Amino acid sequence: MVLSAADKGNVKAAWGKVGGHAAEYGAEALERMFLSFPTTKTYFPHFDLSHGSAQVKGHGAKVAAALTKAVEHLDDLPGALSELSDLHAHKLRVDPVNFKLLSHSLLVTLASHLPSDFTPAVHASLDKFLANVSTVLTSKYR
């Protein structure tokens, strides 16, 4: 799915509004995913998955950092996320459906924190962006 110039502008603007809350929102999205889709917990058997856990916060920060990198490299997502794609495909072997579940949880989290900025156009652009990120992260499964 190709991001238009308007989509790229919407994604950059929305992520700019996230600002210093990226790690916090990443952790919240993970918690939301674990609660809404309990099967996703199977990939984190060694984590304390309770609310506010340091491990969930730490992984949320990693998710946020990866998304920040993706936003900074919208024109080369495969290059920017190549190592992360290798990790998830070859070492962690995460079921690709989980990226969609996390994307949904991220959209809900962003909508709850940025209600006035989360217009239908921004929602659509972020959804396309996260779908592209998911596609890149699962590209090495084949």
Curated annotation (Swiss-Prot):
Binding site for O2: H59
UniProt keyword Membrane present: no
Binding site for heme b: H88
Tissue: Red blood cells.
PROSITE patterns found in the cross-reference section: GLOBIN
Entry-linked SUPFAM superfamilies: Globin-like
GO CC terms, sorted: haptoglobin-hemoglobin complex; hemoglobin complex
Domain (Globin): residue spans on this chain: 2-142
Keyword Heme: yes
A Gene Ontology biological process term: cellular oxidant detoxification
Modified residues (Phosphothreonine): T109, T135, T138
The protein's assembly and partners: Heterotetramer of two alpha chains and two beta chains.
Family: Belongs to the globin family.
Protein function: Involved in oxygen transport from the lung to the various peripheral tissues.
Protein name stated in the entry: Hemoglobin subunit alpha
Organism: Bos taurus (Bovine)
